[in-house]
Amino acid sequence: MKASLALFSLLTVFTSYSLKSPAVPPTVAQIQANSNFAIADGARQQIGSTLFYDPAYVQLTYPGGDVPQERGVCSDVVIRALRSQKVDLQKLVHEDMAKNFAAYPQKWQLKRPDSNIDHRRVPNLETWFTRHDKTRPTSKNPSDYQAGDIVSWRLDNGLAHIGVVSDGFARDGTPLVIHNIGAGAQEEDVLFSWRMVGHYRYFAK
Protein backbone atom coordinates (compact mmCIF):
# COMPACT_ATOMS: atom_id res chain seq x y z
CA MET A 1 0.00 0.00 0.00
CA LYS A 2 2.79 2.42 0.95
CA ALA A 3 4.62 1.56 -2.24
CA SER A 4 1.50 2.31 -4.29
CA LEU A 5 1.05 5.69 -2.58
CA ALA A 6 4.70 6.55 -3.16
CA LEU A 7 4.40 5.67 -6.85
CA PHE A 8 1.22 7.75 -7.15
CA SER A 9 2.93 10.74 -5.51
CA LEU A 10 5.91 10.42 -7.85
CA LEU A 11 3.67 10.31 -10.92
CA THR A 12 1.72 13.32 -9.67
CA VAL A 13 4.87 15.36 -9.21
CA PHE A 14 6.20 14.32 -12.63
CA THR A 15 2.92 15.14 -14.37
CA SER A 16 2.68 18.48 -12.61
CA TYR A 17 6.22 19.39 -13.62
CA SER A 18 5.65 18.29 -17.22
CA LEU A 19 2.50 20.40 -17.56
CA LYS A 20 3.70 23.51 -15.77
CA SER A 21 7.41 23.73 -16.54
CA PRO A 22 8.22 26.36 -19.18
CA ALA A 23 9.19 25.28 -22.67
CA VAL A 24 12.90 25.25 -23.40
CA PRO A 25 13.74 28.24 -25.63
CA PRO A 26 14.93 27.25 -29.09
CA THR A 27 18.63 27.50 -29.73
CA VAL A 28 20.07 29.83 -32.36
CA ALA A 29 20.75 26.80 -34.56
CA GLN A 30 17.12 25.72 -34.29
CA ILE A 31 15.89 29.20 -35.16
CA GLN A 32 18.16 29.25 -38.21
CA ALA A 33 16.97 25.81 -39.27
CA ASN A 34 13.39 26.99 -38.94
CA SER A 35 14.24 29.98 -41.11
CA ASN A 36 15.65 27.68 -43.78
CA PHE A 37 12.47 25.64 -43.58
CA ALA A 38 10.50 28.88 -43.97
CA ILE A 39 12.45 29.64 -47.15
CA ALA A 40 11.12 26.36 -48.54
CA ASP A 41 7.64 27.36 -47.41
CA GLY A 42 8.08 30.72 -49.13
CA ALA A 43 8.85 28.86 -52.35
CA ARG A 44 5.87 26.56 -51.84
CA GLN A 45 3.51 29.54 -51.53
CA GLN A 46 4.32 30.37 -55.17
CA ILE A 47 2.89 27.10 -56.47
CA GLY A 48 -0.49 27.90 -57.97
CA SER A 49 0.13 31.65 -57.95
CA THR A 50 3.17 31.90 -60.25
CA LEU A 51 1.78 30.31 -63.40
CA PHE A 52 3.99 31.50 -66.26
CA TYR A 53 7.63 31.67 -67.27
CA ASP A 54 8.31 35.18 -68.53
CA PRO A 55 11.90 36.43 -68.98
CA ALA A 56 10.90 39.94 -70.08
CA TYR A 57 13.01 42.84 -68.84
CA VAL A 58 10.86 44.91 -66.46
CA GLN A 59 11.46 48.25 -64.75
CA LEU A 60 11.29 47.50 -61.03
CA THR A 61 10.96 49.63 -57.96
CA TYR A 62 14.00 49.58 -55.69
CA PRO A 63 14.39 48.12 -53.18
CA GLY A 64 11.77 45.39 -52.89
CA GLY A 65 10.88 45.39 -56.58
CA ASP A 66 9.22 42.39 -58.21
CA VAL A 67 7.57 41.38 -61.45
CA PRO A 68 3.85 40.46 -61.26
CA GLN A 69 3.37 37.45 -58.98
CA GLU A 70 1.74 35.32 -61.67
CA ARG A 71 4.90 35.32 -63.80
CA GLY A 72 8.66 35.25 -63.58
CA VAL A 73 11.74 33.11 -64.19
CA CYS A 74 13.61 30.52 -62.13
CA SER A 75 15.49 33.13 -60.13
CA ASP A 76 12.24 34.82 -59.09
CA VAL A 77 11.31 31.67 -57.14
CA VAL A 78 14.48 32.11 -55.08
CA ILE A 79 14.08 35.87 -54.75
CA ARG A 80 10.50 35.58 -53.50
CA ALA A 81 11.30 32.68 -51.17
CA LEU A 82 14.04 34.70 -49.49
CA ARG A 83 11.85 37.78 -49.33
CA SER A 84 9.49 35.71 -47.19
CA GLN A 85 12.34 35.83 -44.66
CA LYS A 86 12.90 39.57 -45.17
CA VAL A 87 16.00 38.99 -47.31
CA ASP A 88 15.98 41.28 -50.36
CA LEU A 89 18.34 39.88 -52.98
CA GLN A 90 17.61 42.80 -55.28
CA LYS A 91 19.14 45.17 -52.74
CA LEU A 92 21.93 42.85 -51.61
CA VAL A 93 23.12 41.99 -55.11
CA HIS A 94 22.87 45.59 -56.32
CA GLU A 95 24.86 46.94 -53.38
CA ASP A 96 27.58 44.32 -53.78
CA MET A 97 27.81 44.83 -57.54
CA ALA A 98 28.01 48.59 -57.09
CA LYS A 99 31.13 48.11 -54.97
CA ASN A 100 32.61 45.07 -56.72
CA PHE A 101 31.33 45.14 -60.29
CA ALA A 102 34.38 43.37 -61.71
CA ALA A 103 33.83 40.40 -59.37
CA TYR A 104 30.61 39.51 -61.19
CA PRO A 105 30.24 37.75 -64.57
CA GLN A 106 30.70 40.09 -67.52
CA LYS A 107 28.22 38.33 -69.81
CA TRP A 108 25.79 41.10 -70.69
CA GLN A 109 27.97 43.96 -71.96
CA LEU A 110 26.98 46.18 -69.05
CA LYS A 111 29.13 49.03 -67.77
CA ARG A 112 27.39 49.40 -64.41
CA PRO A 113 24.92 47.56 -62.17
CA ASP A 114 21.24 47.45 -63.12
CA SER A 115 18.90 46.90 -60.17
CA ASN A 116 16.09 45.89 -62.55
CA ILE A 117 17.73 42.69 -63.73
CA ASP A 118 21.07 41.87 -62.03
CA HIS A 119 19.52 39.87 -59.17
CA ARG A 120 17.33 37.94 -61.62
CA ARG A 121 20.36 36.48 -63.42
CA VAL A 122 21.44 33.11 -62.08
CA PRO A 123 25.22 33.63 -62.51
CA ASN A 124 24.96 36.82 -60.45
CA LEU A 125 23.09 34.99 -57.68
CA GLU A 126 25.71 32.23 -57.72
CA THR A 127 28.43 34.85 -57.39
CA TRP A 128 26.68 36.66 -54.54
CA PHE A 129 26.02 33.46 -52.58
CA THR A 130 29.65 32.41 -53.04
CA ARG A 131 31.05 35.81 -52.06
CA HIS A 132 28.94 35.80 -48.89
CA ASP A 133 29.88 32.31 -47.66
CA LYS A 134 26.57 30.60 -48.38
CA THR A 135 28.10 27.67 -50.26
CA ARG A 136 27.68 24.02 -49.36
CA PRO A 137 29.30 21.01 -51.04
CA THR A 138 27.61 19.58 -54.10
CA SER A 139 27.09 15.84 -53.98
CA LYS A 140 24.87 13.01 -55.17
CA ASN A 141 23.85 12.19 -51.60
CA PRO A 142 20.21 13.22 -51.00
CA SER A 143 20.83 13.60 -47.26
CA ASP A 144 23.22 16.49 -47.93
CA TYR A 145 20.30 18.70 -48.95
CA GLN A 146 17.76 20.21 -46.59
CA ALA A 147 14.57 22.19 -47.04
CA GLY A 148 15.34 25.79 -47.95
CA ASP A 149 18.67 25.06 -49.63
CA ILE A 150 19.21 26.73 -52.98
CA VAL A 151 20.65 24.72 -55.85
CA SER A 152 21.82 25.81 -59.29
CA TRP A 153 22.52 23.77 -62.40
CA ARG A 154 23.56 24.00 -66.01
CA LEU A 155 20.86 22.48 -68.17
CA ASP A 156 21.67 20.18 -71.05
CA ASN A 157 21.52 23.20 -73.38
CA GLY A 158 24.03 25.08 -71.21
CA LEU A 159 21.55 27.53 -69.70
CA ALA A 160 21.76 28.36 -66.01
CA HIS A 161 18.90 27.28 -63.76
CA ILE A 162 18.16 27.64 -60.04
CA GLY A 163 15.60 26.38 -57.54
CA VAL A 164 14.75 25.84 -53.87
CA VAL A 165 14.88 22.46 -52.14
CA SER A 166 11.45 21.72 -50.68
CA ASP A 167 10.41 19.75 -47.61
CA GLY A 168 8.86 17.08 -49.84
CA PHE A 169 10.54 13.89 -51.01
CA ALA A 170 10.38 11.57 -53.98
CA ARG A 171 9.62 7.89 -53.37
CA ASP A 172 13.33 7.09 -53.30
CA GLY A 173 13.98 9.72 -50.62
CA THR A 174 15.41 12.40 -52.90
CA PRO A 175 14.33 15.90 -51.85
CA LEU A 176 12.00 17.60 -54.30
CA VAL A 177 12.75 21.03 -55.78
CA ILE A 178 10.48 24.03 -56.28
CA HIS A 179 11.45 25.85 -59.47
CA ASN A 180 10.14 27.53 -62.60
CA ILE A 181 11.49 26.04 -65.78
CA GLY A 182 8.64 26.97 -68.09
CA ALA A 183 5.22 26.40 -66.52
CA GLY A 184 5.33 28.52 -63.39
CA ALA A 185 6.39 27.43 -59.92
CA GLN A 186 6.30 23.64 -59.66
CA GLU A 187 7.50 21.06 -57.13
CA GLU A 188 9.34 18.29 -58.97
CA ASP A 189 11.89 15.51 -58.61
CA VAL A 190 14.74 17.24 -60.45
CA LEU A 191 17.52 17.64 -57.88
CA PHE A 192 19.89 15.37 -59.81
CA SER A 193 18.43 15.87 -63.28
CA TRP A 194 21.14 18.24 -64.53
CA ARG A 195 24.75 19.12 -63.81
CA MET A 196 24.74 20.77 -60.41
CA VAL A 197 27.14 23.69 -60.12
CA GLY A 198 25.99 25.37 -56.92
CA HIS A 199 24.56 24.42 -53.52
CA TYR A 200 23.80 27.21 -51.06
CA ARG A 201 22.31 27.51 -47.58
CA TYR A 202 21.34 31.02 -46.56
CA PHE A 203 21.03 30.45 -42.82
CA ALA A 204 24.05 28.39 -41.75
CA LYS A 205 23.17 25.55 -39.39
Which residues does each predicted region cover?
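Second-shell loop/turn segments in exported
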Residues: 25-32, 60-69, 111-115, 136-140, ...
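...with weaker cross-activation on analogous glycine-rich loops/strands in unrelated enzymes
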Residues: 37-40, 98-178
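Acidic helix-start/capping segments at beta-turn-to-alpha-helix junctions
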Residues: 54-75, 88-112
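Low-complexity, Gly/Ser/Thr/Pro-rich intrinsically disordered linker/tail segments
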Residues: 172-205
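Sec-dependent signal peptide recognition
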Residues: 2-8
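Bacterial Sec-dependent signal peptides at the C-terminal "C-region" and cleavage site
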Residues: 10-30
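Sec-exported extracytoplasmic/periplasmic mature domains
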Residues: 44, 48, 79-87, 94, ...
